[in-house]
Swiss-Prot record:
Keywords: Amino-acid biosynthesis, Aminotransferase, Arginine biosynthesis, Cytoplasm, Pyridoxal phosphate, Transferase. InterPro entries: AcOrn/SuccOrn_fam (IPR004636), Aminotrans_3 (IPR005814), Aminotrans_3_PPA_site (IPR049704), Class-III_PLP-dep_AT (IPR050103), PyrdxlP-dep_Trfase (IPR015424), PyrdxlP-dep_Trfase_major (IPR015421), PyrdxlP-dep_Trfase_small (IPR015422). This is Acetylornithine aminotransferase. It comes from Leptospira interrogans serogroup Icterohaemorrhagiae serovar Lai (strain 56601). The keyword Protease does not apply.
């Protein structure tokens, strides 16, 4: 048996195990990756792929970053986990770094974005209770995505995510994104009952839909006027994805709370809820918790991730590569009628098509490019923040060759 046959057999065995033992909750592509190096992935046959996906905006520093590997090894030699019933040098240092680079307040560390959203939801409920609001309302946006837990689904403005589970949590109302009049009307309709407004600065799962500056500014003004929390879900936009460490930095104001995950741990599971000073005392001892959240290993990796972003000119590379990507994609839009819109910010890019995006993503994969198909007709482009301009252009060449045929 030659190497190709061995690799094919290994991959087939992997598929059979997955199909037999894993719940059928994912529509997987017909490939398994064995290793990666920065912006490149390699499958069982050692075929090379340029990664424009980053595990859904997770591996922002690429694959197998040497400094991340060293921190994992070093911390694993010392301590994985004790619990949050004891002080942790790694968690304390990470919390300090997050606050110094966001806004004054305190941090709750989690294992995932969904758990960070759960914390934000409980924060809003705690706030309602503290104000004796009997029938509180949390505003969210249509087309939003906030996770797969019951609270996350309840906050998510997409029927396809919510369906099949019966009645979800009450007290959540949805408004159209970037509709200033609808936002004002909601605050008027539920005056005295709104305790929070939660927003993704760029709606990711619905196809990279940026919220306008006017809408975001109005959101801040209305929440302040009505003494409601403004919660930003930066799980996907955070950690340098849009060209700044956090997307809110370019807005001229801060939210009252912010959720993080994905790129925070460079692929190691960790999330965070940052709560501003005004609301940080709503959580008291015993009112919230996590067994694994922010354990020694996860916190050490997250700290190193932020340090790397701040010391390696990563954000400068994001802005350079973003200019290249948007220029080329808009040139493609002029040439190929199949493209209806190019949108996004930094290396968080959506390519809206006039045809379904799944076949496009599959064709790209066959040609050696990993992209994400979302919202039925959007190709989501999220390469590592460390990608070289050479591989960026090679990936865009592959994408263009696929679009030419459609």
């Amino acid at each position: 048996m030659n190497d190709a046959d061995i690799h094919k057999e290994l991959f087939q065995h992997t598929k059979e195990l997955a199909d037999h033992y894993l719940l059928n909750t994912y529509a997987r592509y017909d490939v398994a990756f064995r290793y990666g190096v920065n912006e490149l992935l390699f499958d069982f046959d050692n075929k090379q792929y340029i990664d424009f996906h980053c595990g859904v905006a997770v591996t922002n520093l690429g694959h197998a970053d040497p400094d991340i590997i060293e921190v994992v090894r070093s911390q694993a030699d010392k301590l994985f986990h004790t619990s949050n019933l004891f002080y942790s040098e790694e968690a304390s240092k990470l919390a300090e770094l997050l606050i110094l680079n966001s806004f004054p307040g305190k941090v709750f560390l989690t294992n995932s974005g969904t758990e960070a959203i759960e914390g934000a939801f409980k924060l809003a409920r705690k706030y309602a209770y503290s104000k004796s609001i009997v029938d509180p309302i949390i505003l969210s946006l249509e087309k939003s995505f906030h996770g797969r837990s019951v609270s996350g689904m309840s906050l998510t403005g997409q029927d396809k995510i919510r369906k099949g589970y019966g009645e979800l949590l009450k007290g959540i109302e949805f408004i159209e994104p970037n509709n200033d009049e609808a936002l004002v009307a909601a605050f008027e309709r539920y005056q005295g009952r709104i305790v929070a407004l939660i927003e993704e600065p760029i709606l990711g799962e619905s196809g990279i839909i940026p919220l306008s500056r006017n809408f975001l500014t109005l959101s801040r003004e209305l929440t302040e006027e009505n003494e409601a929390l403004l919660i930003f879900d930066e799980i996907q936009t955070g950690m340098g994805r849009t060209g700044t460490l956090f997307a809110f930095e370019t807005m001229g104001f801060s939210p009252d709370a912010m959720t993080l995950a994905k790129g925070l741990g460079s692929g190691f599971p960790i999330g965070a809820l940052i709560v501003g000073e005004k609301y940080q005392d709503l959580f008291t001892q015993g009112s919230h918790g996590s067994t694994f959240g922010g354990n020694h290993l996860a916190a050490a990796v997250a700290y190193e991730t932020i340090r790397i972003i701040q010391t390696r000119e990563i954000l400068n590379n994001v802005n350079i590569c973003s200019d290249i990507a948007f220029t080329r994609l808009r040139e493609m839009q002029e040439k190929y009628p199949v493209i209806s819109e190019v949108r996004g910010k930094g290396l968080h890019i959506g390519l809206e098509l006039k045809v379904p995006s799944k076949p496009i993503a599959e064709a790209c994969l066959s040609a050696g490019l990993v992209v994400n198909a979302t919202a039925d007709n959007v190709v989501r482009i999220m390469p590592p923040l460390t990608i070289s301009t050479d591989f960026l252009n090679q990936g865009l060449d592959i994408l263009e060759s696929v679009l030419k045929q459609n």
